Amino acid sequence: MKVSLFSTCLVDVFEKRVGIATVELLEKLGCEVDFPAAQVCCGQPAYNSGYHEETKKAAKNMIKAFEQSEVVVAPSGSCVTMFKHYPDLFKNDAKWQARAQELADKTYEVTQFIVEVLGITNVGAKLDGVATIHPSCHMTRLLGNVTAPAKLLNEVEGLEVVELPKYYNCCGFGGTFAVKMSDVSGEMVDEKVDCIVESGADYLVGGDCSCLMNIDGRLRRRGVDVKAVHIIEILNNQVEAVTTR
């Protein structure tokens, strides 16, 4: 199957290893991966701030960038969710709405794609330790990808997956929310870290780099010895096992 990678801004700028891991794993699973060079930001920061006309410009660029793609896959539930918003952006423009719907229908978050499209839950990954999952808000509440990450992690040899207390709570990032409401955001991520500690996990696993960067920053500030890792890094055997704490 031919797959086009939508890398996302945070992966492209800060977490390139996540993008590389995504490509490597998809290729191991039999996919042919390309990278449409015209892709830029999905427009989510502008959209969340109320700049919908500016968002349309970004959306049109992305629609054109992936128009020839068979399937689009991204290592982010948040950015994939933004693609799903595109048809509504063009509700008063039938031509662009149809093109936006075509893109939305063929775009998947990477774990969702592996489980629901490829039909794979065991990718042959190995990692010793205990992991807990942070189910990001956009990934679960908006995209509806609730079970795929756990299905994949539960098949990782040597890894025990435990439930995160209050797992449904937001980590406090929320894009521009973390800037505009920094005090509230700080309290929210502190609560998330408390829950991670309570879980006893060695690894905090997520599917959105934005949440992981936010949580990892607070883990480091508080001196908590837990690794915050993107799920694709575990599935691609890129995470070094922790030593006994």
Swiss-Prot record:
Annotated GO MF terms: oxidoreductase activity
Superkingdom: Bacteria
InterPro entries linked to this entry: Cys_rich_dom, LutA
Family: Belongs to the LutA/YkgE family.
HAMAP family xref list: LutA (MF_02105)
Function: Is involved in L-lactate degradation and allows cells to grow with lactate as the sole carbon source.
Protein name: Lactate utilization protein A
Organism of provenance: Macrococcus caseolyticus (strain JCSC5402)
Lineage, opening ranks: Bacteria, Bacillati, Bacillota, Bacilli, Bacillales
